[in-house]
Amino acid sequence: MEGFLNLDKPAGLTSHDCIARLRRVLGERRIGHGGTLDPAATGVLPVAVGRATRLLRFLSEGKVYRATVRFGLSTDTDDLEGNILADAGAADLDLGRVQVHLQAFRGTISQVPPRYSAIHQEGERLYDLARRGVAIAEIAPRTVEIQALTVLDWYPGHYPELQIEIACSTGTYIRSIARDLGTALGTGATLARLLRTRSGPFALEASLPLAAVEAGFQAGTVPLIGPRTALAHLAAVHLEPPLAARWLMGQRVPGDCEGAFAQIWECETDRFLGVAACEAGSLQPLVVLPTL
């Protein structure tokens, strides 16, 4: 069993919890995911099974989220899972004020990851240090790209909430956006809900709940996604049999393609052969997978 799954991660499980369950159900140790979701977050989690795990690093990095930001409340995790640091409410806050500050969160921005995150510092993950009560030195900011940030809805009240859709680069922390927006407004804010609606070609409307994947395996109907779809953002290069034979031996072959990487296929059989680095008129094998 090899290929990709478009998993709809439920709330309450870590991404690793989902992978562990799939390993038990599918009887396959080589299973990985294409982008961590926090335990409270839900939505698209791309999963690779078998040798497809070698292709995870080539998945499209674009992500789309639907997030709900709650104002007037701050926590140490920057979401509702953490301890409350400030609770003053923000009943006077209106959407007009919020929209003025949202512009600063579009385009290329700098953000500091949450204290509770998987970022490594001093050889350990930040969340491990935070849970042990270790004093964390200044966390280095990261540059991320916010391609689009759209207001979907506004809910006034003592703790007003803003629902937004964000298209962003990989490595973007939506919790940091919520926290920093609250800081800019002077009200404090935290992330109340997060749903990932897209990760590269994997869309929420085509995703499967974990229970459905488990039931499908029992029935022999697990809908695996092939590399043509999973790597659709990469150019496809088709090799004639003589060049395909050289490729399968790990040899560089002549060829042109756009971008840094390309899917490689054999012309006659339409077999997927792997992924190449595109280098000035030649294709350098990076991953050779002749029968995926």
Curated annotation (Swiss-Prot):
Task: Please give the superkingdom of this protein's source.
Answer: Bacteria
Give the residues annotated as active site.
Answer: 38
The GO terms this record gives for MF are: pseudouridine synthase activity; RNA binding; tRNA pseudouridine(55) synthase activity
Q: Name one GO biological process term.
A: mRNA pseudouridine synthesis
Q: What is its EC number?
A: 5.4.99.25
Question: Which keywords are on file for this protein?
Answer: Isomerase, tRNA processing
The broad enzyme category this protein falls into is: isomerase
Q: What Pfam families does the database record attribute to this sequence?
A: TruB-C_2, TruB_C_2, TruB_N
Provide the catalytic activity annotation.
uridine(55) in tRNA = pseudouridine(55) in tRNA
> What SUPFAM superfamilies does the database record attribute to this sequence?
Pseudouridine synthase
Briefly, what is this protein's role?
Answer: Responsible for synthesis of pseudouridine from uracil-55 in the psi GC loop of transfer RNAs.
PANTHER family given for it?
PSEUDOURIDYLATE SYNTHASE TRUB1, TRNA-PSEUDOURIDINE SYNTHASE
Q: Which family does it belong to?
A: Belongs to the pseudouridine synthase TruB family. Type 1 subfamily.
Which NCBIfam families does its entry note?
TruB (TIGR00431)
Its name, as the record gives it, is: tRNA pseudouridine synthase B
* Organism from which the protein derives: Gloeobacter violaceus (strain ATCC 29082 / PCC 7421)
